[in-house]
């Protein structure tokens, strides 16, 4: 598949209150956040011209910024209106939406009161559904940091360094993605998604206090309970997963995606029962399109 360069996309990006054509959207090479990972962002999806859970995404974006000491110059309502303006201007139906908040180029000191806070919202036409393909996981050698060492509920660029490294290593070994463990060796998440396991009519998922509690994750839990499925949030060990019959991951970009296998190194665990995952997937699609 031919990749389209993002700067060749037709349309506009909303930057600090203005609509800027894609090809003219630029930042300086000495931008503070480019050097120190001091940015926060959201991953959102628009369906039929409406962003799903936009208020929740916006509130989390502001909380992420505040956790890094960034003062957001816009309210939740103003950010929502900016989304609506961009959707109209770009004639958006289905798209991936990326809001980003970052520090400017006034200084390269670690902290400086004169650093500006900048805000953009970009849209990218949705790619073909990857969620229709099952994936194979490799257990990463890298561990998630202790939750008191970084704001784990902040969706910040810095949080993705380990995820990027882990996924690169997994892909180099022939896998699709990596399963990440926390600092104690319990199952945490995948590189950009939350993970669920299935046995009978019960979902098992790690407690979301050591990694980002995804908005799609919370939505799937709500859907499962509405369908009279039991949901257990627990500390899960790798040794437990061979007792589960199904496995899937959730995230805004991939929605709900089946997991075919997890390679533990000494054995490969296969998951062949997708009935519950497919049920949740159908219900999720119905809701986001509603």
From Swiss-Prot:
Its EC number is 2.6.1.42. GO terms for biological process: isoleucine biosynthetic process; L-leucine biosynthetic process; L-valine biosynthetic process. GO terms for cellular component: cytosol. Gene3D superfamilies: 3.30.470.10, D-amino Acid Aminotransferase, subunit A, domain 2. Keywords: Amino-acid biosynthesis, Aminotransferase, Branched-chain amino acid biosynthesis, Pyridoxal phosphate, Transferase. The modification N6-(pyridoxal phosphate)lysine is found at residue 155. The keyword Amino-acid biosynthesis applies. It is an enzyme of class 2 (transferase). One of its GO terms (molecular function) is L-isoleucine-2-oxoglutarate transaminase activity. Belongs to the class-IV pyridoxal-phosphate-dependent aminotransferase family. NCBIfam families: PRK06606.1. This is Probable branched-chain-amino-acid aminotransferase. It comes from Rickettsia prowazekii (strain Madrid E). The gene is ilvE.
